[in-house]
Each structure stands twice: as C-alpha cells, then as structure tokens.
Amino acid sequence: MDLLVAEVVQLFYTLLWPMIRISAFLLTAPFFSIQAVTVRIRVLLALLLTWMVYPLAEWPVIDPLTALGLQEIFMQIFIGVLLGTLLQVVSAALIVGGQAISASMGLSMANMVDPNMGNVPVIAQFLIICSTLIFLALGGHIIVISLLLESFQLMPIGEMFEAQPLMALIIQWSSMMFLGAVLLAMPIMVSLLLINIGLGVITRAAPALNIFAVGFPAMILAGIILLSMSMSSIGFRIQWLWQESFKIMNQALGVA
C-alpha cells in the first residue's frame, strides 16, 4: 500500500511540471485564451497535452513544497507565459492598426465590448476575426502546440537557463506591435488623408458647403471601400505576422 502511494505521489510530481508550463501557455496564447474556449476545455486540453508529452522525456522528481520546487513553479509559469506573450504581440498589432484605421475613418468612438480585449474599435475587431481565421488556416494551432511540446526538449524541466537573452529577444519582438500596425493601417490612412485634404480644398472653394454633413459620411464610405479593396494585401500581411511569430517562438527556444 505504501509502495502504491509512493508511486502515485511520484507520478504527480512528474506530471505537475509540464502541466504548469502548458497551462500558463494556454492562459496567455491567442485563440486558446479567448472566452469561447472555456476553462473546462483548457483544463482538458492541458491534461491531454501533458499526457502526450509525458513519455517523451525523463522527468525529474521535485517536491513543489521545497524551495527548489517553488523556484521551478515560477520558472515553468515564466516559460509558458513567455511563449504565449510572443504570440499576443500579433493580436496587439491588429488592435493598434484597427484603432488607427478607425480614427482615420471617424469611427474612433464606435467600439465593441470584447470579453477578451475590452473596448475594441469595430475595425480592430474585424481584423482580429480575420487573423483568427488565417491563424487556423495556416495550421497555427498545430504549429504552436508542436513548438510547446518541443520546448520540453530545448528547455528541460529542472535545468536553469540565462534569462537575459530571452528578455532582449522579447523587447526586440515587441517593436513588431507597432511595425505590424503600420503595415496594416498605413495604406488606408494615407488614402483617407488625401481624401480629407480634398474635402478641405472643396470646403475652401465653397464655404457654404456643410463639411460636417458631407465629410463624415464620405470618410466612412471611403474607408469601407478602401478596406474592402485592401483585404487581399491585409490578409497577406496578417499571414506574414503569424509566420514571424512562429519563427520568433522557435528562436526563443533556441536562445534558451
């Protein structure tokens, strides 16, 4: 009986560490952390992935109630959150780009209550939906799960690694939030700026024209037309952002 209890405790100690890393990743990564994926589904997915990764390596037996165990808990949470946050940069770039487009169209006050992101402009919400579909079409959910499972080979549990190169990589990658937003929003913003200048010239030539009655509907209509015409190029840019995020995850695992 004592032998059986000891085996169960040892199994729990070995399953605990991959479970913590996988759970931290599922709580922060896009698509897996949305409200539509309930806590029950995330727990079941974490258990399934833990059971899949368990035969792939020899797991150290570390008591979580010791100082070494507490250190290992924080380490696994850090790794899982790190990998999930690298993907969240793409979602942040879409929100910033959507906000810029909405402001140019005069829709900055037209917000939707997103349970995941809070108050998000309608254009940003539209881009997030498109990016989710592109993420699934690329097989992103399979790619990130395979990278997560590969992390147990490249960043083994119980081994220390230098955090400074990882922090430098995170800071470098965070600039993609603004670069991605510029890539998505700049063509539409420049076009709307030229239309705005044209409306200003018309107002100057015909002062009796009520620019507020004509300008706002014209900007919204022009923005919708430009957005529909630019969807092909926007889709390619979103695809490029996701592919870069997969590369940076792979690079982060290599740096560690």
Per-region residue spans from a language model:
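Hydrophobic alpha-helical segments and their helix-loop boundaries in membrane
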Residues: 1-256
